[in-house]
Each structure stands twice: as structure tokens, then as C-alpha cells.
Amino acid sequence: MNESNSRRTFLKTSSALVGSSFLANGSQKKIVPKSGEIKVGHGEFIYKVVPNWGLLDAGKNPVNDCHEMVEDAKGRLFLLTNEVKNNVIIYDKSGKLLESWGTSYPGAHGLTILNEGAEQFLLICDNTRHQVIKTDLKGREIFKIEYPRETGVYDHPNQFVPTETAVNPKNGDIYVADGYGANYIIQYDSKGRYIRHFGGYSSSYSDQKFNCCHGVLVDTRDPLNWSLLITDRVNQCFKRFTLDGKFITRYHLPGSFVCRPVLHGNYILAACFRSTDASWSGSGYLQILDKNMQVVSTPGGSEAIYLNGILQKQMKDDDHHVFIHPHDVYADSDENIYVPQWASGKTYPIKLERIN
């Protein structure tokens, strides 16, 4: 199942802290936008669009859907696309191509970077292969996680359509979100050996179940109580679980069809591939949430309004049409944001430069 088919199915059914904390207003050098520059965001989190960042020769380095991005210890940016001419494209922060690899991941969807001692590795979720593949940074495959027959809830491999992984930086445990499949979260050890599973699909809302568990994150912001933050996309929320799969609470994001939660210092970043209604094509935007899980900025979308502590419905609000269908967001140590997009005309990622 490729991303487009997975998305149609969705519509029918409708690592340690990365980088430094977002800098407070006034604690970094101001970048004054020039006349005519496009700005997005709210409050202390306003950005200008960097024109033509990352554009490549589409004949040599094409992309299809640009799904996710991560950064390695050398400051290189890894882009995952389901274009089998080069599934992984590696940029420097100026947008220059450094290298590319990968020709065997037709359903490339989820990308996670993990540390093991002095080495780093990648986890790739492939919708079409129904696998999670661990590779080194050059693309050499280390091992594969096949469909989890050990759970007793999967009858055949095609039921397993993983969308995302997260890694516990303490013990290396891997959490796989089967967001386009049976909607379980499956926990493995660092070698890919099954530990447990929880969740499962429900068309009606349930605290313990999901309707498109598209993303998962090990949230390390509370040093004494690490937890899982999991997307429940059709229900427009993140859910918090213990590391062994017990439900804690829900954070409702009305109007926002969120992809995966991304940790950056004390903030959570998220791409919303569509808003208001899942059938509203081209209605995506980004969200930034603080340590209390309150939305503080929505680049490309309407400003967050809270009434009696309850977030009101948000929607697309972008006269410049900066985003079409954002699928992921990554913030670097300079507070700049990179946004790969799904079903957006085979466009390369967008870079946003922090203004304040």
C-alpha cells in the first residue's frame, strides 16, 4: 500500500531531545524581513519563507511525496521520499545536495534517527513492504521488523502498514505505530524482538484506541516521568500513554489532522496535513505547542484561541498558500524549520527562517 492509497483509506474511515529549546523573544539575533517577504506564524514564533531552498535537478534527484526529515550529529538533513530513484536525500542546511541513496523503499513513509554509542542509525517505515527497516546512515540494512504475528491480532503481512517509529533513548526500545494498518502500537527491544502491543482501531472515540495512530514520540521533557505521545489523527488529538501502554490523557486539537509529534526542547512541533475537514485539499499548516501542550503558534493556520481553557477549532489561514499538505516538521539548532510535504506536486521541502 503506497501513501496515496493509505491516505484514501484514511479519508474513507474518517530519541532524546533534539536540538536546543526554542529561544525566547529577544534571546537570539533578530532577522528583519524585507518588503515582500512571506511571513507565517504567531506571537514569538514567526518565520519567513526561504525561497527556493533545497531545489534539485528533478531529472537526477526527483522526489514524489516528501514524508519526513531528521538531522544527524554532523548537521546533515536526511529527507525521506517514496521516490525509488533516491529514497533518502541528504542536504546541508543551505539546501545543497550532499548525497543520496535508496532504491528499494516504494512505500517509504516514516523516518527516525537513533543513537547507539557513537553511531547513529535510521528506522524507515515502508507502507508497501509492510516492514520497518533499520539502516546505517549510508543505507546498509541492519535488520527488518516484519508484521507482528507474535501479537496474535495480525493474520497476514498486509494488515501491518507502519507509519512511524519512536525510540526510548535509555534502553533502545522501539515503538512502531501501525497507523495505516490495525492501529496498534507495538513495542520491541533494540534488536527488534517483540515486547507488547496496545491500542487497536476504533471508528468511534475511545481513550485506549485509535483512528489513524499516524505518529509516536517518546516524550522526555519530564525527567522523572517519560511517556509516549501518540497521534490519533481522525480524532484530531494527541494522546499520552505510559511507556507500557496505559492511557494518561488526551490533548484535543480541533480542526487539525496532525501527523507526528516532534520534540524540540520544551516544545512539540507538528505538521497538520489537512484542517477542518479531511477532504479539504491543500488545507495544511504547522502547529507549535508549549510544555503545557498549549498551541502557541500555527504557521499557515488560524491563530489559536482558548475560551475557558478550551482550544477553539482551527483552520487554514494562509493568503500566500505556503503549504499544501505538510507531512512533517523539523527544527534545527538555529530555530529554523524544514517542512516536507505529501501530495504537493512533487515539491522539495520548505525552509522557514525564525524571525523572533
List the predicted regions and their residue ranges.
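Surface-exposed loop and turn segments in beta-propeller and other repeat-based domains
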Residues: 51-60, 143-156, 195-208, 296-319
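Beta-rich, blade/repeat-based domains predominating
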Residues: 61-74, 104-120, 150-171, 203-227, ...
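Conserved beta-strand positions in repeat-built beta-propeller and related beta-rich domains
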Residues: 79-83, 122-127, 176-179, 220, ...
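Blade-loop segments of beta-propeller domains
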Residues: 86-89, 93-119, 127
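Loop/turn-rich, solvent-exposed surfaces of beta-rich toroidal or solenoidal domains
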Residues: 256-302
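Blade-level signature of beta-propeller repeat domains, shared across WD40, Kelch, NHL, RCC1
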Residues: 325-356
